[in-house]
UniProtKB/Swiss-Prot annotation:
Organism: Dechloromonas aromatica (strain RCB)
Cofactor(s) required for function per UniProt: FMN
Catalytic activity entry: 2 a quinone + NADH + H(+) = 2 a 1,4-benzosemiquinone + NAD(+); N,N-dimethyl-1,4-phenylenediamine + anthranilate + 2 NAD(+) = 2-(4-dimethylaminophenyl)diazenylbenzoate + 2 NADH + 2 H(+)
Residues bound to FMN: 9, 95-98
InterPro entries for the chain: Flavodoxin_fold (IPR003680), Flavoprotein-like_sf (IPR029039), FMN-dep_NADH:Q_OxRdtase_AzoR1 (IPR050104), NADH:quinone_OxRdtase_FMN_depd (IPR023048)
Molecular functions per Gene Ontology: electron transfer activity; FMN binding; oxidoreductase activity, acting on NAD(P)H as acceptor; oxidoreductase activity, acting on NAD(P)H, quinone or similar compound as acceptor
Function description: Quinone reductase that provides resistance to thiol-specific stress caused by electrophilic quinones.
Protein name as annotated: FMN-dependent NADH:quinone oxidoreductase
């Protein structure tokens, strides 16, 4: 088994979402001792955003790209290859202003490529990253689960499903900014959820 952990926090150390993702990965390793873990921290190793030069590179045929364009596409290729190679993905996701961190959106923009991780058929789009288990560890200061303010879960369900990753579990630690007692309770409940999911 090969596991990819993505830490999406803007903080490379001390992030609640990373703590939660670490707990998920540790539980997977406990149940799969021979598993291999690859870690990608999006704060300490930021990926370039999808801007006009990047779009130009992606839409230029490979044999016509400049050296600079080829280098830019290669950065995305590396992320795609990494995702293609793993069996399980653990995403550590904090909530920033009701959405996902820009670091995570940039990663998603990099791995979502027509003809590679999804394609269009006569019946519509089909995701090509099938057969992967995804755990999304959500850390939030307030209480947003199952409310209109939670834009993260619908978005992540949609985009991961679009890419073929439909076996997704969401793990919640909420109320982390609402006092020490609330935070302690949130982590305890999240850890119990992890133990139940990865039995």
């Amino acid at each position: 088994m090969k596991i990819l952990q993505i830490n999406a926090s803007a903080r490379s150390a001390g992030a609640n979402s990373t703590r939660l993702a670490d707990t998920v990965t540790a539980r997977l390793l406990a149940r799969n001792p021979n598993a291999v873990v690859e870690l990608r921290d999006l704060a300490s190793h930021p990926h370039p955003v999808l801007d006009e030069p990047a779009l130009g590179a992606l839409f230029t045929p490979a044999d016509q790209r400049t050296a600079e364009q080829s280098a830019r596409v290669a950065l995305d290729d590396a992320l795609i290859a990494q995702v293609q190679s793993v069996d399980a993905i653990v995403l550590g996701v904090p909530m920033y202003n009701f959405g996902v961190p820009v670091q995570l959106k940039t990663w998603i923009d990099a791995i979502a490529r027509a003809g590679v991780t999804f394609h269009y058929t006569e019946k519509g789009p089909e995701g090509l990253l099938k057969g992967k288990k995804v755990y999304v560890a959500l850390a939030r200061g307030g209480l947003y689960r199952d409310t209109p303010a939670d834009s993260q879960v619908p978005y992540l369900k949609s985009v991961l499903g679009f890419l073929g990753m439909t076996d997704v579990e969401f793990i919640y630690a909420e109320g982390l900014a609402m006092g020490a007692e609330s935070a302690s309770k949130a982590f305890a409940e999240a850890e119990a959820q992890i133990e139940e999911l990865i039995a």
